[in-house]
């Protein structure tokens, strides 16, 4: 089985794949600094909790947007699993062509999202990932990555409100019953959630208009993607595991035999 690791700014999402099937998944907080031993032992423990033994993992692949933890994470896999993981980075085989002047500037997470959206749902496809940042990326019918958009994520926007406005509290991010808030909390929730819905619908329509790809599928992923996709008719698919699936698809293109 393959261990796929999606290293984001908030969490490391881990998926165990048996072929194209996700056998188990779990998360580790990214922000806490850890040693290679801590990563190795933590991964071993969490795998066991999900009925997966260390010896069941014969290879690993990492997709990361957080460079400063990569050394410890890679060494943890080498030391505890005897695996030198594949890293999703510039030059790796993905099956899609990146039609931008500087392909190396496109985040690894965006590439694997694009791979998964195109291979699983076909093109043209607009993939939206509601993570720490909200990203929109377009892939045409031939599998060409055309470009994308990066916007502040809902949590970043929320954090800016309660950190920079003295009287605004930290709140739970959820859809309120009405768009017109009746108090501070519900008015903040309305602004955050409905503001994101409005942004999403506008960008979807604008991308389709500029590209002329009005038949493009819209595929959504990310932690808060379910809230947004449930509130707009412009989204075709919500796939919470899209990024992990993309990492696994990229792994399978490398034709690498497992270490063990």
From Swiss-Prot:
A Pfam family: Pan_kinase
Active-site residues, record numbering mapped to chain: 109
Origin species: Agathobacter rectalis (strain ATCC 33656 / DSM 3377 / JCM 17463 / KCTC 5835 / VPI 0990)
NCBIfam families: baf, PRK13318.1-6, PRK13321.1
Alphabetical list of CDD domains matching this protein: ASKHA_NBD_PanK-III (cd24015)
Binding sites annotated in the UniProt record for ATP: 6-13, 132
Family according to the record: Belongs to the type III pantothenate kinase family.
UniProt name for this protein: Type III pantothenate kinase
E.C. code: 2.7.1.33
HAMAP family noted in UniProt: Pantothen_kinase_3
Location relative to the cell: Cytoplasm
Gene Ontology MF: a single term: ATP binding
Gene expressing this chain: coaX
Binding site for substrate: 107-110, 184
GO biological process annotation, one example: coenzyme A biosynthetic process
InterPro entries for this protein: ATPase_NBD (IPR043129), Type_III_PanK (IPR004619)
Cellular component GO terms, alphabetical: cytoplasm
Function of the molecule: Catalyzes the phosphorylation of pantothenate (Pan), the first step in CoA biosynthesis.
Binding site for K(+): 129
Pathway note: Cofactor biosynthesis; coenzyme A biosynthesis; CoA from (R)-pantothenate: step 1/5
